[in-house]
């Protein structure tokens, strides 16, 4: 998986490309832990080029959401494919995550 991070004003945009699974989920976790939350209002996950997400990937996104919420930082997930949106819906994550489909 490829992860790109860009910072614009008080927004961190993390773009994921490839597969978010057991092998690659720790990469996203490490990237999220490297963010200076004192300077950030919103973290945006751009999933436009994400092909697949496993339960490990969902777990990392849930942990990121909880961590950000405890710090008063918003998590926004954008460019979600129909397939990945189905997973968010089936797990109930779509009920509390700010998600925008493609």
Residue ranges of predicted features:
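Histidine-anchored nucleotide/phosphate-binding helix
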Residues: 61, 65
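STAS-like cytosolic regulatory interaction modules
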Residues: 1-52, 66-102
């Amino acid at each position: 998986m490829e992860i790109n991070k860009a910072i614009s004003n008080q927004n961190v945009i993390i773009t994921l490309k490839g597969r978010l699974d057991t092998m690659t989920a720790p990469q996203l976790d490490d990237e999220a832990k490297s963010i200076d939350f004192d300077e950030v209002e919103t973290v945006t996950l751009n999933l436009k080029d994400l092909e697949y997400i496993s339960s490990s990937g969902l777990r990392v996104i849930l942990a990121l959401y909880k961590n950000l919420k405890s710090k008063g930082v918003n998590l926004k997930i954008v460019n979600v494919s129909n397939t990945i949106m189905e997973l968010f819906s089936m797990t109930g994550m779509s009920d509390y995550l700010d998600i925008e489909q493609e």
